[in-house]
Regions:
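Residues within mature, well-folded domains
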Residues: 20-162
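Bacterial N-terminal signal peptides that target proteins for export
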Residues: 1-8
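C-terminal motif of bacterial Sec signal peptides marking the signal peptidase cleavage site
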Residues: 15-18
Length: 162
């Protein structure tokens, strides 16, 4: 393949991938067209207005989770990237549950256990102000959120001796 053909093919692939990204879906798009472009969602949940929410997660490797909300006529109303510190900070200790966390953020990137907490720690990868971070949601054995903590995610060849 000649150089210019390879370049055209690469550009077409990039353009096609960009069109199939949740944030590029246009309001008013029919649900069937969005699902055809994006594939099967991670989760689907009913909305109070008779519509439904499609949740597309890029966890565990990615740092985004998108809510695509559709009205009762199955038309796209909004697209929201929900993996933000503000949304995790809005979780209410002792009130929010495993189910509400799952409905908001989708499945975690990692589920961990530590000696000092009797329950699961759900870890989500996110990007906050271009800084890779992790949100750790502590969920007790009854399925209730007890704490949310944040850590910076160290990526690549980190050398603490530098």
């Amino acid at each position: 393949m000649t150089g210019w053909r390879a370049l055209v093919l690469a550009a077409a692939c990039v353009a096609a991938a960009g069109c199939a990204s949740p944030q590029w879906q246009k309001p008013g798009a029919p649900l069937a067209a969005v699902e055809q472009a994006l594939g099967r969602p991670t989760l689907v949940a009913p909305l109070a207005n008779g519509g439904e929410r499609l949740l597309y997660s890029r966890q565990p490797a990615g740092q985004q989770v998108y809510h695509l909300d559709f009205d009762a006529q199955r038309r796209l109303v909004s697209v929201t990237q929900v993996l933000t510190e503000a949304r995790f900070q809005a979780l209410r200790d002792g009130v929010d549950t495993r189910e509400s966390v799952l409905a908001t953020f989708g499945p975690p990137a990692l589920v961990e256990h530590v000696a000092r907490f009797d329950g699961d720690i759900w870890t989500y990868r996110l990007l906050e102000n271009l800084t890779p971070r992790q949100a750790h949601v502590h969920i007790d054995p009854e399925g209730v959120v007890r704490r949310v903590m944040f850590t910076d995610e160290i990526l690549g060849d980190f050398d603490p001796g530098r």
